[in-house]
Amino acid sequence: MLKIFICEDNKDQRQSIERIVKNYLMMVDLDARLELSTDLPNDILKWRTQEQHDYLFLLDIELNHEMNGIILASQLRESYPHAKIVFITSHTEMAFLSFA
């Protein structure tokens, strides 16, 4: 099963991403679910499981928090080395940070 996580501090953006993910999952035959959608990076870091799954993290780069999406991704990578991480931003100048 693919477990999907969203971390976006803008409520409207987060709800839009949730709708896109849920609509896509309804259209395709994929063993996946939206596990958690939050504005707090620590909510994602607290979530732990011993079960083996595939993980997809959709992370805003610039969060209204002491931890940004890049730092969150590096911490997630330690626990989930094979997870897929997608950075989301509406700031074009921030987009290149994900390739550093």
Regions found by a protein language model. Give the residues of each.
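A generic structural motif
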Residues: 25-36, 53, 81-83
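Non-catalytic signal-transmission and effector/linker regions of two-component phosphorelay proteins
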Residues: 1-5, 15-18
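Acidic, metal-coordinating helix/loop segments flanking the phosphotransfer/catalytic sites
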Residues: 15-18, 33-56
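Charged phosphotransfer/docking patches of two-component systems
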Residues: 11-18, 95
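Conserved acidic carboxylate
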Residues: 8
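A structural signal for isolated positions on well-ordered beta-strands in alpha/beta enzyme cores
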Residues: 3-5, 33-35, 86
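CheY-like receiver
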Residues: 54-100
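Short catalytic helix/loop segments, enriched in acidic residues and glycine
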Residues: 21
